[in-house]
């Protein structure tokens, strides 16, 4: 932040500055008047020895001659204007350093100097010199101390993003809240509110070939009938007068009564007793309960039979609402249930099931043994029951005692499991009845909800000592799902609490946690607005609510990383302003957030490739939410952090100090607070030990093991998921799919018990065979919205359809004959198939029934083919004769004008209706190939036919078996493309995608081992797994990419130390959130919790160990694999170009010679000596090819005493090799030592020499690094973090402390460079010279200081506490000694008295 003094017209009194502390100018310091523009006068910089004062075109501040050592320190200084050719930023004013700093005195100079800034109100230069933008270092023309001067104004427009956030955080937050509020209001008012009444909608494939045909077929069925678009009969008056009673199903029992009542006078007594006892036969539409023995024994014993009767009476019939729901007899009493005990009472002539005896059970078992053989052989069928005369010949072999009553057939067909008395167990002496079904005399549906919740929902009410209810089919699945979706909402809320509670513990701030939660909710609300209004999506499925947890998991990772970087910038810039911290933090975090957000959203958007509408809607909503969160986080998080830092952090600390003063209870609380603080410190120490030392050391040292282990896990997961046993496909169509946990009675009935009873195995009226429906006249085009399952399709007529021509008649007749010759044609189908309607027409025309409607031309006319009009006329007459009520389907569809609009021809195949995907696929492929061949020979009017069947389950299975692999592959490809665009590094992108792919493969393999079915919920979350597993890997990838070190091991350690702690905390919080969702009843919540647990934990492992181990082996070094662009300057690029080039920082050919009045010397830097600690062998990871200390070792000690006892030489010249502090703190942000063991060139000129005393190296030529903007300039103009590959974080190092000799404390190297006018070339730029240490390196004393202007201090302290007073032994800021060797990095030194850990270690 700028804390500058304001200008005043008079110089008598100090003017208050706009700084945060209200700095004032010291008394007695004169203010010079404005002298004019900077371009009015140009002066040459004169060395301090030549002139005691420097003139300025703006000011003239006399500087006292520093040669008089006895006088007081100078109180005035001369402001020096910055010319347009100066490499310094022109937006800053400079003042020269005291002259005595150029002398080699024995004491530290400048300790008592006070420099006053001359106020100034003129305009600034427009732009900096271009030489400062090329990423190279050039010494400045004049020695300057950089400060920022800001005019005093009531309002000043922010010049940068960081300044906007730092100075106006409340305004930024309010603006974001206003945008969120407006978008929420527009989203709620501009579209329909979401309707979750049918939460299972959207899980049927749509917009596929099979799905479109099914949708059109359902629409054709819905639009066919009386008073509809199409008619089965061409008579208009008949269709218009037909009432809805024609389509209304007959009342229960009416069909049976109409067929039975005329025969009741001759029926036996047993049959009349059964009809009087039960209210007809059991039906599928009744509610059902499944009983099993508690002791795993047989249910065919008297105790179990009586137990079932009592449980029904106590739990169901005693409920108050049962009487209003049950079917009633003629006596207005509730009908008895169809249970094993009641059938036993009927066959034994008992009044109730509780009156039956053991003898009755034994007698009935013997009768069942006899009749079971005929039932399983197919002889005992409903048509054989009763004493009627019109029975099929095969009924004659059935004994009368088995067929005279329907009780035996109903017991075997409806109530007893298929294994009881099956052909394999008929000879058992004591057959075992494992399961028995009970039919309640109430229809299935929502009316049973109260009975279920009051009596059947609790498990302890469904069991006694003999039997228990383990399965139910009450028709309540949809209704109960809506109930539990609301009731189980507590589990996702607990998961959210776990995520944000872990975040609060990590951030140690409730305010920040609430702001993050508010940011997540705001992102979702804005995404809802875009989803509803911008994208105009009509359907908002219930699964979109899962985006709250998914986005919270992504946000948790970003938040932890951000505040780690925020704390790090605070520790590295303790005196820097908030604008500096925001700029430095967002330089790294903005890059990471951009790459992570784009990669995650691209992975979610890839799921749009799915054909399930619910999955596509979630992909669109979740991808949009991630992008909105990306945009919002760029301003929301830093503004929240600034707000907390400015108004809450310091105020809370002050209130906390004053709150503990008081009585004994408060002292007790203080003791507790101290204990908790001690625990927190212990946890922090453990965290530093684990993530700063052990984890990097373990990853690098055992990288061989990690690569092999995780590669084997990924390969095993791929084998399990793709080869054996694989993910099982669903066995039920979407409406009956699994929605509750597997142990729920509803799910157990559908998954286990439904197939155990023979009446459920075969669909009614169709014999269990797959039908084939051939359609002509309607195109298979789904005109509905593929993203809205509620939208219905309309029928698209085929304009070329014609079935009345002679060629069409011949082809249709031949199609019937050829179909009968196919192997899949069922020859035992009942009645004539409508496929052969031409044969049916021929037989009708030759039959006597043709004349029922009166004399007609059709009767007796056998000339084939007929004329088109005659053919259509006879078809209409046949339809009227055989279906006078308009309900019999002959395969003909007429429109309102009586014309033939469509043909719907059906026949039955010998393929069984099975949930087996392979068998259904064989049926579909065989029929498709046959029909394609037939249509190829069809006349033009019949070539656009198509077929469908009972393929709802197959359509879902086909989509789930093919789409997840495609979606995951596309998601990985998009992730790779996004990472490549973000890093421009091919190896890093490949390694990241490999880690993400390994995460997905291992996760799917684990889900297979958990016996997951690849159902709709699983497909939903598998499509999101790539998006969930990206962020941890991106954390490490970006941190590795932004690391300033060129060697891969240092970069691996750097990235692990920087992000591993936040990554582990985020994974632990999400694991806890997943565990809290496991008790939920709704399967969606449970599986979302499992996915969160598995994906995040597996992703953390693959990112931390597999990805980093790959980088240890094959990670890019320097520019390896980097797609270079003109604006991308890597931190290790300086000085590595062509040696003969005119690159900044390289010595020019004529600059070595001395200039007039100067005695230039050359210095050369040697690698700094390092000393191993005793724990080196156990605490570092070393290379087998060298004995250099590991980059992970922090045990190398920094010495305050002399490293060498060689006497120090006196400086040869006042102008020594100096360092510009801008180059120090911008080019290489991390602490690093120059290593003689690693050189970039293919033929290094120097080699390390090792002996038993330590490590030495040959001298290396040095070259200064390129300068950049100073920290002050960064606050006003943030660096472009997307063009620069170097991180702005300073002090993040994996190397160890180094030391130079401290034998000569007076031989210091100044911070900035002063250049005489003779050293300037023709263009006014300084001429660079190569420096040499002349073999005196061991006696060089490095006392470099950081040049920072602290606006938080009063102006009177600036001269003593700015660049002079700061940077002492206690200052933790690092210093840099540039290396003249272009292939080697600079020498970075840590302050002597600090030994930091964590990121700065």
From Swiss-Prot:
TM ranges: 170-190, 484-504, 510-530, 542-562, 589-609, 617-637, 704-724, 964-984, 990-1010, 1019-1039, 1064-1084, 1088-1108
UniProt-listed InterPro entries: Dispatched_Hh_regulator (IPR052081), SSD (IPR000731)
Ranges of residues in domain SSD: 471-643
Signal peptide (residue range): none
Record membrane topology: Multi-pass membrane protein
Region (Disordered): 1-91, 113-138, 241-264, 1169-1192, 1229-1337, 1352-1401
GO BP term, pick one: smoothened signaling pathway
Subcellular location: Membrane
One Gene Ontology term, aspect cellular component: membrane
Transmembrane listed as a keyword: yes
Biased composition (Low complexity): 1259-1270, 1352-1362
Keywords linked to the UniProt accession: Glycoprotein, Membrane, Methylation, Transmembrane, Transmembrane helix
Bias type Polar residues, positions: 1175-1184, 1284-1305
Residues glycosylated per entry: 239, 349, 465
UniProt KW Metal-binding keyword: no
Family: Belongs to the dispatched family.
Record-given protein name: Protein dispatched homolog 2
Annotated source species: Homo sapiens (Human)
Gene name linked to the record: DISP2
């Amino acid at each position: 932040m700028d804390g500058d003094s304001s200008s005043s017209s008079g110089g008598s009194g100090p003017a208050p500055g706009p700084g945060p502390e209200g700095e004032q100018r010291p008394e007695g310091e004169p203010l010079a008047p404005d002298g004019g523009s900077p371009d009015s006068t140009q002066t040459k910089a004169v060395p301090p020895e030549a002139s005691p004062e420097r003139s300025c075109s703006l000011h003239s501040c006399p500087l006292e001659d520093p040669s008089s050592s006895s006088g007081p320190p100078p109180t005035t200084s001369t402001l020096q204007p910055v010319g347009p050719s100066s490499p310094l930023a022109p937006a800053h004013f400079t003042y020269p350093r005291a002259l005595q700093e150029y002398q080699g005195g024995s004491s530290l100079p400048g300790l008592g100097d006070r420099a006053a800034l001359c106020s100034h109100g003129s305009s600034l230069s427009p732009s900096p010199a271009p030489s400062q933008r090329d990423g190279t270092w050039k010494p400045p023309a004049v020695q300057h101390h950089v400060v920022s001067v800001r005019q005093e104004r009531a309002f000043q427009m922010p010049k940068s993003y960081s300044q906007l956030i730092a100075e106006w955080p409340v305004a930024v937050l309010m603006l974001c809240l206003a945008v969120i509020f407006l978008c929420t209001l527009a989203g709620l008012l501009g579209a329909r509110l979401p309707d979750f009444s049918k939460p299972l909608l959207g899980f049927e494939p749509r917009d596929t070939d099979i799905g479109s045909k099914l949708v059109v077929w359902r629409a054709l069925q819905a639009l066919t009938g009386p008073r509809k678009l199409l008619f089965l009969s061409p008579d208009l008056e008949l269709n218009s007068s037909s009432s809805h009673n024609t389509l209304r199903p007959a009342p229960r029992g009416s069909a049976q009564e109409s067929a039975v009542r005329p025969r009741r006078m001759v029926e036996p007594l047993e049959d009349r007793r059964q009809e009087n006892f039960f209210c007809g036969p059991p039906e599928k539409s009744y509610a059902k309960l499944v009983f099993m023995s508690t002791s795993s024994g047989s249910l065919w014993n008297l105790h179990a039979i009586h137990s079932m009767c009592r449980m029904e009476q106590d739990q169901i019939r005693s409920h108050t609402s049962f009487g209003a729901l049950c079917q009633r007899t003629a006596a207005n009493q509730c009908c008895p249930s169809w249970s094993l005990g009641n059938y036993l009472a009927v066959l034994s002539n008992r009044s109730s099931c509780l009156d039956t005896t053991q003898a009755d059970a034994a007698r009935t078992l013997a009768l069942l043994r006899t009749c079971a053989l005929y039932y399983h052989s197919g002889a005992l069928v409903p048509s054989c029951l009763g004493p009627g005369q019109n029975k099929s010949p095969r009924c004659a072999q059935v004994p009368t005692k088995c067929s005279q009553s329907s009780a035996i057939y109903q017991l075997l067909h409806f109530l007893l499991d298929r294994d009881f008395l099956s052909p394999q167990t008929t000879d058992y002496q004591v057959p075992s009845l494992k399961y028995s079904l009970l039919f309640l005399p109430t229809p299935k549906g929502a009316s049973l909800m109260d009975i279920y919740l009051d009596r059947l929902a609790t498990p302890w009410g469904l069991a006694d000592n003999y039997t228990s209810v383990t399965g139910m089919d009450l028709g309540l699945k949809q209704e109960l799902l809506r109930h539990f979706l609301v009731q189980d909402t507590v589990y996702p809320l607990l998961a959210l609490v776990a995520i944000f509670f872990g975040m609060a513990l990590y951030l140690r701030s409730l305010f920040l946690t609430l702001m993050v939660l508010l940011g997540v909710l705001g992102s979702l609300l804005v995404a809802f607005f875009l989803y509803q209004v911008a994208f105009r999506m009509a359907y908002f499925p219930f699964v979109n609510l899962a985006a709250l947890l998914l986005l919270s998991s992504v946000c948790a990772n970003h938040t932890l990383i951000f505040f780690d970087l925020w704390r790090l910038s605070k520790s590295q810039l303790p005196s820097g302003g908030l604008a500096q911290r925001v700029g430095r933090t967002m330089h790294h975090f903005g890059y990471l957030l951009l790459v992570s957000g784009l990669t995650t959203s691209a992975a979610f958007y890839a799921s749009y490739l799915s054909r399930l509408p619910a999955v596509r809607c979630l992909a669109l909503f979740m991808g949009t939410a991630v992008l909105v969160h990306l945009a919002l986080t760029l301003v929301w998080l830093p503004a929240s952090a600034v707000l907390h830092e400015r108004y809450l952090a310091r105020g809370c600390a002050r209130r906390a100090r004053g709150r503990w003063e008081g009585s004994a209870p408060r002292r007790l609380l203080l003791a507790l607070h101290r204990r908790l603080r001690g625990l927190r410190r212990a946890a922090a120490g453990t965290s530093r030990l684990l993530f700063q030392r052990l984890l990097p050391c373990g990853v690098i040292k055992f990288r061989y093991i990690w690569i092999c282990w995780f590669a084997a896990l990924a390969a095993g997961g791929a084998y399990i998921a793709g080869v054996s046993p694989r993910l099982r496909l669903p066995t039920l169509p979407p409406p009956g799919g699994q929605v509750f946990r597997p142990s729920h009675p509803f799910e157990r009935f559908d998954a286990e018990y439904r197939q155990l009873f023979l009446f459920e195995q075969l669909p009614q009226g169709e014999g269990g065979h797959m039908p084939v429906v051939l359609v002509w006249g309607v195109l298979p085009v789904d005109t509905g919205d593929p993203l809205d399952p509620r939208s219905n399709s309309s029928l698209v007529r085929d304009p070329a359809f014609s079935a009345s021509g002679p060629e069409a008649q011949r082809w249709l007749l031949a199609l019937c004959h050829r179909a009968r010759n196919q192997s899949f044609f069922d020859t035992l189908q009942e009645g004539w198939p409508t496929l052969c309607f031409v044969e049916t027409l021929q037989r009708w025309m030759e039959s006597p029934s043709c004349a029922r409607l009166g004399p007609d031309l059709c009767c007796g006319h056998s000339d084939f083919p007929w004329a088109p009009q005659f053919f259509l006329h006879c078809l209409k007459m046949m339809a009227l004769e055989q279906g006078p009520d308009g309900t019999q389907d002959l395969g003909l569809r007429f429109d309102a004008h009586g014309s033939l609009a469509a043909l719907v021809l059906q026949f039955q195949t010998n393929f069984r209706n099975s949930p087996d995907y392979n068998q259904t696929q064989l049926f579909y492929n065989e029929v498709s190939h046959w029909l394609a061949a037939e249509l190829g020979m069809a006349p033009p009017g019949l070539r656009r036919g198509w077929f469908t069947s009972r393929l709802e389950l197959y359509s879902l299975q086909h989509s789930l078996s093919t789409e997840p692999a495609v979606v995951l592959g596309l998601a990985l490809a998009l992730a790779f493309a996004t990472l490549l665009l973000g890093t421009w590094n091919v190896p890093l992108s490949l390694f990241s995608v490999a880690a993400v792919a390994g995460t997905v493969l291992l996760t799917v393999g684990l889900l297979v081992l958990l016996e997951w079915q690849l159902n709709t919920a699983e497909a939903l979350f598998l499509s999101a797994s790539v998006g969930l597993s990206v962020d941890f890997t991106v954390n490490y990838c970006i941190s590795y990419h932004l690391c300033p070190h060129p060697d891969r091991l240092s970069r691996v350690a750097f990235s692990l130390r920087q992000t591993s702690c936040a990554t582990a905390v985020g994974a632990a919080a999400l694991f806890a959130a997943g565990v809290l969702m496991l008790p939920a009843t709704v399967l969606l919540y449970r599986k979302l919790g499992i996915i969160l647990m598995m994906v995040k934990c597996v992703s953390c492992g693959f990112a931390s160990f597999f990805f980093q181990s790959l980088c240890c082996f094959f990670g890019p070094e320097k520019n390896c694999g980097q797609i270079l662009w003109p604006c991308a300057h890597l931190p290790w690029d300086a000085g590595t170009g062509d040696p003969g080039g005119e690159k900044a920082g390289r010595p020019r050919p004529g600059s070595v010679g001395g200039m007039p009045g100067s005695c230039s010397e050359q210095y050369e830097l040697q690698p700094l000596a390092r000393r191993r600690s005793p724990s080196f062998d156990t605490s570092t990871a070393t290379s087998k090819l060298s004995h250099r200390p590991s980059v992970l070792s922090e045990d190398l000690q920094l010495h305050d005493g002399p490293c060498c006892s060689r006497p120090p030489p006196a400086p040869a010249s006042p102008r020594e090799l100096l360092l510009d502090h801008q180059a120090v703190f911008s080019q290489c942000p991390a602490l690093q030592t120059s290593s003689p063991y690693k050189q970039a060139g293919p033929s290094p000129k120097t080699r390390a020499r090792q002996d038993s005393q330590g490590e030495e190296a040959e001298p290396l030529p040095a070259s200064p690094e390129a300068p950049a903007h100073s920290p002050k300039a960064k606050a006003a103009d943030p660096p472009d973090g997307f063009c620069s590959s170097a991180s702005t974080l300073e002090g993040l190092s994996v190397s160890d402390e180094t030391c130079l000799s401290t034998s000569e404390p007076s031989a210091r190297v100044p911070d900035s460079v002063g250049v005489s006018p003779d050293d300037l070339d023709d263009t006014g730029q300084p001429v660079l010279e190569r420096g040499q240490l002349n073999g005196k390196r061991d006696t060089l004393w490095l006392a470099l200081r950081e040049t920072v202007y602290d606006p938080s201090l009063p102006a009177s302290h600036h001269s003593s506490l700015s660049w002079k007073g700061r940077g002492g032994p206690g200052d933790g800021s690092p210093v840099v000694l540039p290396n003249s060797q272009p292939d080697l990095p600079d020498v970075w030194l840590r302050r002597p008295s600090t030994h930091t850990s964590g990121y700065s270690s």
